């Protein structure tokens, strides 16, 4: 397999749009799978994604669009998946073309619901893609800031670091700095957990807790994340690196963070359903909370922040009560 070959973006949201912008900074052309034909038609007519990051202009002559996932897969060598994790299986069920010989990059910051497996493991287990042909793209990088070409840092993780370096070079630009890692599982789990902790930060903000407490919350969150990672995937990793701690910080504090926004609404008294309807965007942390909770039943890691968020979202315990109990466990 010659990498990267022809690159395909698999998804049509804001992060997919940002990644397409990164790719086209170096690639002559890309393929792009979007579910809706009307969205594709509007994109071609307007020269930008009609629903997400509308300020990012594209030369659509350099993009081959299709709503047929099989057509895109056949014509591509590297598939960058950027669909929300709850919808991944529905998209993949349409596949008739084998993907085990493709190179897969997952930029999905979630766990496959019901299966409770990280996305890289799902591609290996269900589609026979070798682990060395799967990479994870992560880091403290909001799509909105990529659109504005504000300096951002990304990490590409793959068991084969030489392959990771190839993609790091292809995604880098004047506003994107890249690094590589082989901690695929750790980075995927941390990408899920940071969304859970961002919901916690939002809930506390909605309850009018101040910056002082937020600092304590995030300090405890990184410790909790480290305990979980060292249990489920022991490795000599440094969670102070930007792909772990940096991603947690930006997701927990930024106004661009949909998970923090979702949590803030919950803290202000919204129900889960009403918050989801008003946001009109997927807060991955809602699904990630239940998945990590289920996974942790087998590991018994002490995770009071996760437990508090789970109790609020799924057991409908009052945020006021649950966060008060959480404050008593902090140091």
PLM-predicted stretches and their roles:
Residues 56-65, 129-133, 174-176, 301:
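A short helix-to-beta-strand connector/capping loop
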Residues 1-56, 63-67:
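NAD(P)+-binding Rossmann beta1-loop-alpha1 motif at the extreme N-terminus of oxidoreductases
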